[in-house]
Amino acid sequence: MLMREGQTTVIYRSEYTAPAYWIDTVDLSFDLDPAKTRVLNRMRVRRNPDVPAQPLRLDGEELNLARVLVNGQGTSFKMEGQQLVLENLPEGQDAFDLEIFTTCIPAKNTKLMGLYVSNDSFFTQCEAEGFRRITYFLDRPDVMASYTVTLRAEKARYPVLLSNGNLVEQGNLEDGRHFARWVDPHRKPSYLFALVAGRLVCREQRITSRAGKDHLLQVYVRAGDLDKTEHAMNSLMASVAWDEARFGLPLDLERFMIVATSDFNMGAMENKGLNIFNTKYVLASQATATDTDFANIESVVGHEYFHNWTGNRVTCRDWFQLSLKEGLTVFRDQEFSQDLAGEASARAVKRIEDVRVLRTAQFPEDAGPMAHPVRPDQYLEINNFYTVTVYEKGAEVVRMMQTLVGRAGFAKGMALYFERHDGQAVTCDDFAQAIADANPDSSLSRLLPQFKHWYSQAGTPRMGAIGHYDADAKRYTLTLAQHCAPTPGQPVKLPFVIPVAYGLMAADGRELATGMHVLTSATDTLTFDQIESAPVPSLLRGFSAPVILDTEYSDDQLITLLAHDTDPFNRWEAAQRLALRRAIKLIAEHADMTRAGALLELDTPFLEALRSVLRHPGLDAAFKELVLTLPSETYIAEQLDVVDPQAIHAVREGMRQQIALKLAADWEAAYEAHRDTGAYHPDPVASGQRALAGLALSHLCLAARETGDTVWPGKTYQRFKDASNMTDRFNALSALVSSGHALAEPALARFHALFKDEALVLDKWFALQGGAPDRGGDVLPTVRQLMKHPDFNIRNPNRARSLIFSYCSANPGAFHRTDAAGYVFWSERVIELDAFNPQVAARLARALDR
């Protein structure tokens, strides 16, 4: 969220104090009307005996205050900035009744924070500080209260009335209105409050828990979208079953609801028992969603459901502890998706995909001006801290804990965490302590104070590795060293605890040694005896720590790892290193040339290594697709001291062109072998086959552009027209667009005509064009033209992200134009968005924080 004028108060973690008052119960009554919603808030409040007596300060924003009563009597109050201050309150420790009546205008709430209207339905978003836009309150996560909510609205217009917890009463009122009363049996902070009202339909499923309890699961959507909710429901059922099986955490409500809305700033929100989702993470059908969409829905449904325990039952003491719930829950959703994937190879693919996100999004954040620890020490605006560091790096910190105590030990630690803290608002320290205390003999327990540097220090550590082989003694020594560069406000870094999973490979592919070493000092040396020949070290297997590995592999060593390593992650990593090495060399050679791709030649050993992967009968298609995809332009840029986005783009495109031309026959064979996956199912095996077929098509279209061949573009266009599922259709369309073929234009027009009524599919259509390779500076004019398209609406966050973010944040070669026109466009859009939705504007502003 961009800073408002005059907003300069820095909040410090070290200055945390408990609230001066506790709120035990909240009884909210809403008379819902888009133009004027009335909110009656009755609270049972008591002084906190541990804090010196002081006035009660309640947060509120954009509210019209009508009355304030204490124990049924009028009372004096004053406004200080955005706070309602009450000084004349009953003395002593007895609880008192506080009643506040306010009104607000949901129809004018374009920020989509608090209570707002979308498609003639009411929705809420309260995390982090949205509840204060609904009523005056102690809007902080350590104030946990029991909520009763009564909703009243016009029945014909808003037939469905939902809130947190269990429905206890509903009925008709006069004048065509009706009501519903909801009681949440669990205490919660205000950020987990939610209400929904509107014309919605739902898919229902009754389930029975392991303990024999019955639960009702519901997925609510707009009429017409019900046929796209089956996968979301299946994902929810799988999430409930998995959390109970893996961690012994059952569903604790009679019903659990998901509601989808197309106007949503986030991906989804874990409000207790009433999750509100962006439609992007609920709606899917074979015709409208790709394999990636299906996988994302499974992951996000899991993530929000898992918050029911890690975030809701145990919440954050303050917002500095955000990773307590988010890092842990990202880890849980990653484990869920890996467990559902089943096969070891599919688990490895999921792990590689997660690491790819971390390295292309989080590593740059750690290396830039926005670098901050997983648990920040200060903030100006909390909404700006919903970052890949807090989420994805936070998940890696939790994963290292599991590595250090073992999977069973981690489950024991989770059980102790809930035993100690259920119903409380706690800290990252409390969580780490519980995992360590449950495993007193573990290295985590022994190293806990040092391990917590992962929470307090920003930046990505670099781990150096130097091997030496003594042929006479048959001894191999491996020296490891760690270093972390200064980050803003943290010039000196203390050593981290780095779990290093390793193996030693012989040149013929035999594994000579394997194990786990925990690096705790600046340098450390490992010695291996009876090693018959000079080994190739395979380090940080499975990406056992979120660090950058600095080691001088030869090409032959990398080719050995790519061919033989038993760790799939390091096989993939070897291919990435081979490609990266060539990209960096070519960028240096071609930095002053305008079109590097035309002059570029790749060496035969590299091409043959890729060819052998493509031909390997024992490797999964999904794994091949990952290995054969070059490092992203963003990741390449991170390896360079001087970044020239145009040169990076030209070299990467030139490398793709060479791989397309030199491996053309193999790409044809791969496409023919994987083009038909039978009846559609988004499982890992079939998804991997479609992904490899799509990658093959994109290379065949690239080769055709160079050779003048018309056959493969024609086949691709036919594939686009005939495809029975969105994955194959969109892969074909992407191949035509990314190769710059003339058939891209009719294909884009046909795609729009087919899906003009499907909002999420149109988002793909806009995104594909905003993210297209820039051949001659034509992407920005295309983006400006698309902003005038009748289907473009900048006020819808999904649509704004699809076009503007795809260009500014995901297309560096096109965005960082030498004439700065990309920056002009970016600044115009940030200012335009900030006028009505500061949160989306703040996200866009970060396109330039690297």
Question: What kind of region is each of these model predictions?
Answer:
Residues 50, 64-71, 444-449, 460-539, ...:
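Beta-strand-rich binding/interaction modules
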Residues 101-204, 567-572:
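Extended, low-hydrophobicity, Ser/Thr/Pro/Gly-biased non-transmembrane segments
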Residues 182, 213-472, 477-478:
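Hydrophobic alpha-helical and helix-loop surface patches within well-folded domains
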Residues 40, 44-62, 136-139, 145-154, ...:
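Surface-exposed beta-strand/loop patches in extracellular or lumenal glycoproteins
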Residues 41-45, 60, 94-109, 147-155, ...:
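Short, hydrophobic/aromatic-enriched beta-strand segments in well-ordered soluble domains
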